[in-house]
Amino acid sequence: MSHSKQSGTEAGSIPRVLISADRSSSGKTTISMGLMAALVSRGYKVQPFKVALDYIDPSYHTEITGRFCRNLDGYLMDENGILDVYSHACETGSGADIAIIEGVRGLYEGFEGLSDLGSTAQIAKILKCPVVFVINARSITRSAAALISGYKNFDPDVEIAGVILNNIGGRRHAQKAKEAIEHYTGVPVIGIIPRDPSMQISMRHLGLMPALEGRRRLGDGGFEDRLRGIEEIINKGIDVDRFLEIAGSAKSLTSPENSIFSPAAGAGSPRPRIGIALDEAFNFYYRDNIDLLELAGAEIVYFSPVNDPELPDVDGLYIGGGYPELFAAELEANESMRRSIKEASAAGMPIYAECGGLMYLTEKISTGVPGKGTYHDASMPESTYIMVGALPGHTIMGQTRVVSYNIGTLDRDCLIGKEGNSFKGHEFHHSEIREIPEYAEFAIALLRGTGIKGDRDGLIVGNTLGSYAHLHGVAYRELAGSLVEAAGKFRASRAPR
């Protein structure tokens, strides 16, 4: 059966499908990647999405499809915000032919035990999206039918439209599991993926290795070979035409109201220039945040703290998360860049740093120190590295992994908003900051989360603010406009260029 591409249609009517599983490590990320690659090879413009706030899976989705992956989170975003992100992504550029949404953890895992808030299932219902369910079928056959039956009946408003069996040991294994699922549940098995080590993606201590680092470590040829191998396995094991039929069965969506993705009133020239750190050490950004900065009137200029000798001509900085601890030697060696950033901070340039960016702005980072309360990894030698020093404190790689939503309130006016503004964000890190002086000031009071010290986050010196909180501009709508306003004021205060 042939399936025509649907360029030019509205976002609410394009085919879409959500790939989920019963738990993490079932294979949904690799299978999602392979399906995206297979459809791109057929000429489809695939718009990828990731449920929840992960940065790493989206880096692969973006690499494969050539379209920026977007995050959808039902705890941070309301229903209109989710529809807004979805529509904006699908309509960007020349539009998309199909949307593929990768879920997070198990289908029903979320913020609470007694509701679907923050879950993959919640996103499936908001987007009226059929679900293709991945099962790690290693060592199970008939039990797979019981698993699908339970997931199918748990919430009748979630449509499980197809099953992919992963980690299949052989033909007999596949036959028994497929027959049982289709007989007892009526859900078709559309794919059978054999056990194959080439379906594995390298791990990093916060999850998968980001695509940018994967390409750097494997080399362009090795990276492409790995992705091509995954695509070949998917093409052999999955009925891609049936997958497209399921995507095409999605019901139409209504358009979001009052889209945030509209040019801000008064946005025009002169446009303040905001420098965004983007390289192997810093690459954790939500693309929506960058789009919103541009819509608020900013001109975006990318730079590399690892490779560039100094800052470009900019009016503000946004240094996102990443793995500065893995590139601490390179960051320390680039003394001219560290000095350039510290001088910009002292001059009052607005500098906003999240997580890895916060770590970079502190005085030093210690890695690989074995012992209680510290993180030890063979890939990080025991050492201490000098960092920018725009913010006080000593970053230590800690043993306890912090992965949590956070809720905070600004208790002063600053470059990310006004006193009293509140936000929901998330934290995702292995580090902690010690040796913070008593005189240190913070801009954020946390109602939920770990933060930097006690219930405080947003370490602030002058117009420089560093926080463990990752913020999404659709959930915290003051973010982009506040950063652009701060950069515009700094631009106006400088001598004419």
Curated annotation (Swiss-Prot):
The protein's required cofactor(s) are namely: Mg(2+)
- Site Increases nucleophilicity of active site Cys — annotated at 470
Which Gene3D superfamilies did the record assign? 3.40.50.880, P-loop containing nucleotide triphosphate hydrolases (3.40.50.300)
Q: Which pathway is recorded for this entry?
A: Cofactor biosynthesis; adenosylcobalamin biosynthesis; cob(II)yrinate a,c-diamide from sirohydrochlorin (anaerobic route): step 10/10
**Could you tell me what this protein does?**
Catalyzes the ATP-dependent amidation of the two carboxylate groups at positions a and c of cobyrinate, using either L-glutamine or ammonia as the nitrogen source (Potential). Involved in the biosynthesis of the unique nickel-containing tetrapyrrole coenzyme F430, the prosthetic group of methyl-coenzyme M reductase (MCR), which plays a key role in methanogenesis and anaerobic methane oxidation. Catalyzes the ATP-dependent amidation of the two carboxylate groups at positions a and c of Ni-sirohydrochlorin, using L-glutamine or ammonia as the nitrogen source.
Q: Which organism is it from?
A: Methanosarcina acetivorans (strain ATCC 35395 / DSM 2834 / JCM 12185 / C2A)
Q: What is known of its domains?
A: Comprises of two domains. The C-terminal domain contains the binding site for glutamine and catalyzes the hydrolysis of this substrate to glutamate and ammonia. The N-terminal domain is anticipated to bind ATP, and cobyrinate or Ni-sirohydrochlorin, and catalyzes the ultimate synthesis of the diamide product. The ammonia produced via the glutaminase domain is probably translocated to the adjacent domain via a molecular tunnel, where it reacts with an activated intermediate.
Known EC number = 6.3.5.11, 6.3.5.12
InterPro entries per the UniProt record, alphabetical:
CbiA/CobB_synth, Class_I_gatase-like, CobQ/CobB/MinD/ParA_Nub-bd_dom, GATase_3, P-loop_NTPase
The reactions it catalyses are: cob(II)yrinate + 2 L-glutamine + 2 ATP + 2 H2O = cob(II)yrinate a,c diamide + 2 L-glutamate + 2 ADP + 2 phosphate + 2 H(+); Ni-sirohydrochlorin + 2 L-glutamine + 2 ATP + 2 H2O = Ni-sirohydrochlorin a,c-diamide + 2 L-glutamate + 2 ADP + 2 phosphate + 2 H(+)
Return the protein name: Cobyrinate a,c-diamide synthase
Matching SUPFAM superfamilies, A to Z? Class I glutamine amidotransferase-like, P-loop containing nucleoside triphosphate hydrolases
Q: Which CDD domains match?
A: CobB_N, GATase1_CobB
Transmembrane stretches, by residue range?
A: none
Any Pfam family the entry gives: GATase_3
Q: What does the further note read?
A: The a and c carboxylates of cobyrinate and Ni-sirohydrochlorin are activated for nucleophilic attack via formation of a phosphorylated intermediate by ATP. CbiA catalyzes first the amidation of the c-carboxylate, and then that of the a-carboxylate.
Where does the GATase cobBQ-type domain lie? 273-478
Query: Keywords for this entry?
Result: ATP-binding, Cobalamin biosynthesis, Glutamine amidotransferase, Ligase, Magnesium, Methanogenesis, Nucleotide-binding
Q: Family membership, please give it.
A: Belongs to the CobB/CbiA family.
